[in-house]
Amino acid sequence: MEHYEVLEQIGKGSFGSALLVRHKHEKKLYVLKKIRLARQTGRTRRSAHQEMELISKIRNPFIVEYKDSWVEKGCYVCIVIGYCKGGDMAEAIKKANGVEFSEEKLCKWLVQLLMALEYLHASHILHRDVKCSNIFLTKDQDIRLGDFGLAKILTSDDLASSVVGTPSYMCPELLADIPYGSKSDIWSLGCCMYEMTALKPAFKAFDMQGLINRINRSIVAPLPAQYSTAFRSLVKSMLRKNPELRPSASDLLRQPLLQPYVQKVLLKLSFREHDTLPSESERRSSYPQQRKRTSGKSVSFGPSRFGVDQEDSVSSVKPVHTYLHRHRPVDLSANDTSRVVVRRPAVSSVVSNSSKYVPVRSNQPKSGGLLKPAVVTRRASLPISQKPAKGTKDSLYHPNIGILHQLNSPDVSVNSPRIDRIKFPLASYEEMPFIPVVRKKKGSSRGSYSPPPEPPLDCSITKDKFTLEPERETKSDLSDQNATAGASSRASSGASRRQRFDPSSYRQRAEALEGLLEFSARLLIDERYDELNVLLKPFGPGKVSPRETAIWLSKSFKESSPSNLEED
């Protein structure tokens, strides 16, 4: 700390603060992030140390620059990173004041963000908190992706499953209790690009239940018509509900629309490094070969496309410009009707990539029979088949991660609220959340994945912002699901739907406020300050959410989940 001069505080969060500092010898500005360790749980302290270790190993031109880190008197984890004079993307959207960004600028930003995510996913790292406030801009309006407090390092047999992140940027598979991989970051990036294009959030609702319903149905308004059809289709492809159909960062970088911007970025990087790009032979020797993708062949996403000789440590990952031009463009049209088969490995088998899904596309079925999809892997708490799908090959995913292999990856943020500790009702039984149903086919001992039918967009109508119209059920819907689970879900969701909050009723306001105080007191006694911060945040000055909504939401928490305050 003696090498830095503190200038001012530029940010403050639940777990620490951000200070603008100047290096005494370099005379250069940096940001000092101080994460408080005192009065924190063991998981939070481990997460702070993990963020310090992780960001010190990451080197990418579009990720915040790492300068230094240390532990101060055992009370703070201090991380020094590069200062971005342009602020964050959320501020840039507000300053735009309704004037849309040009398509050229958006494509440039998208390419830089995709290069950053490609680098992370190739190193088996999930960011898990990609949002506009974590995307920073330099004075030259270049992108720097930051805030790795929720990042997770995937091992060979691991997928992320904890509900962490910012709710409006969460992907459907995360909300549907399905293990997720790198495609969750692509969804979050799609939400960011939508917000940067339309200057408004992709998913917004008055309460958490409404937000979950919108995400589960992937309901978004059309993008402004001033942008090209190719660009709008690109953004829409990142918001596909099914992660199997969502493109990876590599797929998006190979799109013809983005190729000119990729070339510009590579040219700029080559001048910045005062060196020319390596020859094709040098590039092939410096980075593992990728498998060619052809129609009817196996398609895998993320790091599984690298050869088995790849070393998986972050320090071994080469610059992104060495492997972006090896494949033909991938069609991202929503009209792709190719058959998709999901390989399901055994529980103890090696997962082939950081993403959960490895689809196999085939234009022509095999002679003698039709292809049947295997069961989608769910969490360990849900029933799964122990038998691997027939024909599943050994994975190319390498288990060791070099230096990062020694790091644990607790599912807790050091600078974001613990969403997985807040118990809110998920989509009800009638609303058909994005949960696959396992059915048994006659004459076959293997389960198959049959996605539920897409519900109509107008099946739920909001009477006002406090009361939702229950949806009608059909007998065919009930026949496809477990009757016991459906009855319990309908009972809980129906009870909450029948409640109506009248802001003019002093009695109801008093009861709701009493419930809010009781709930806050219980959180305070249990020292769960992150959830308490989320609960009381709408009462601060200048907040958009009305107080009645916050009071009613806290009352719903109390009534719908009275025993949800136990520690994980």
Curated annotation (Swiss-Prot):
Would you identify the family this protein belongs to, as annotated?
Belongs to the protein kinase superfamily. NEK Ser/Thr protein kinase family. NIMA subfamily.
Catalytic function, reaction form? L-seryl-[protein] + ATP = O-phospho-L-seryl-[protein] + ADP + H(+); L-threonyl-[protein] + ATP = O-phospho-L-threonyl-[protein] + ADP + H(+)
For region Disordered, the annotated ranges are 277-312, 440-505
Fetch the PROSITE patterns from UniProt: PROTEIN_KINASE_ATP, PROTEIN_KINASE_DOM, PROTEIN_KINASE_ST
**Residues of the active site:** 129
What are the Protein kinase domain coordinates in residue numbering?
Answer: 4-258
Q: What protein name is recorded for this chain?
A: Serine/threonine-protein kinase Nek3
Q: Where is the composition biased (Low complexity)?
A: 483-496
For the ligand (ATP), the binding residues are: 10-18, 33
Catalytic activity, EC: 2.7.11.1
Q: What top-tier enzyme class does this entry carry? A: transferase
Its biological purpose is as follows: May be involved in plant development processes.
Basic and acidic residues bias located where? 461-478
Transmembrane stretches, by residue range?
Answer: none
Q: Give the Gene Ontology MF terms in alphabetical order.
A: ATP binding; protein serine kinase activity; protein serine/threonine kinase activity
